[in-house]
């Protein structure tokens, strides 16, 4: 069990988007706040703070997690990928391209979490049906699009990733 005296921070060492970071933070610091405030990676959004909306979705040790209910200290030693880590050489990831090309975003608030959930989902289901896509993104909420274009984008992304 980790014992921390009042006013002391805990050391958190994580690999985010391929880069190791080591910071001292309050034991109560949430992973989403660590990513945004300590690392300056603001693509990951804070929506509900209750794991309901999925805007804070990141990949941690190969699994999709909602970073608003994970303590930064729990992520110590973890490998994390955020939306900023998907693209390379200033080029969009195929999932990002599919979302753009299929008009799968409007206000954009949910987009980073939706794309990260899609990334995880397509690793597990590279050739999904529409029904599987709808089930695979069910924990991520979009108030703007009605999901039709998001589902089309996920199906399109699966084709792009397979070719």
Curated annotation (Swiss-Prot):
Q: Give the EC class as a word.
A: oxidoreductase
Q: Where in the cell is it found?
A: Cytoplasm
Catalyzed reaction equations: D-glyceraldehyde + A + H2O = (R)-glycerate + AH2 + H(+)
Cofactor notes:
Binds 2 [2Fe-2S] cluster per subunit.
**A Gene Ontology term for the protein's cellular component:** cytoplasm
Q: Which residues bind [2Fe-2S] cluster 2?
A: 107, 110, 142, 144
Q: Which UniProt keywords apply?
A: 2Fe-2S, Cytoplasm, Iron, Iron-sulfur, Metal-binding, Oxidoreductase
Under SUPFAM superfamilies, the record lists:
2Fe-2S ferredoxin-like (SSF54292), CO dehydrogenase ISP C-domain like (SSF47741)
Give this protein's Gene Ontology molecular function annotations. 2 iron, 2 sulfur cluster binding; glyceraldehyde oxidoreductase activity; metal ion binding; oxidoreductase activity, acting on the aldehyde or oxo group of donors
Can the keyword Metal-binding be found in this entry's annotation? yes
For this protein, the Enzyme Commission number is 1.2.99.8
Residues covered by the 2Fe-2S ferredoxin-type domain:
10-86
> Binding residues for [2Fe-2S] cluster 1, per the UniProt record?
48, 53, 56, 68
Query: Which function does this protein serve?
Result: Component of the glyceraldehyde dehydrogenase which is involved the nonphosphorylated Entner-Doudoroff pathway. Catalyzes the oxidation of D-glyceraldehyde to yield glycerate. When the artificial electron acceptor 2,6-dichlorophenol-indophenol (Cl2Ind) is used, the enzyme shows a broad substrate range (glyceraldehyde-3-phosphate, formaldehyde, acetaldehyde, propionaldehyde and isobutyraldehyde), but is most active with D-glyceraldehyde. It is not known which acceptor is utilized in vivo.
Q: Which PANTHER family match?
A: OXIDOREDUCTASE WITH IRON-SULFUR SUBUNIT
Q: How does it assemble?
A: Heterotrimer composed of a large chain (CutA), a medium chain (CutB) and a small chain (CutC).
This protein's name: Glyceraldehyde dehydrogenase small chain
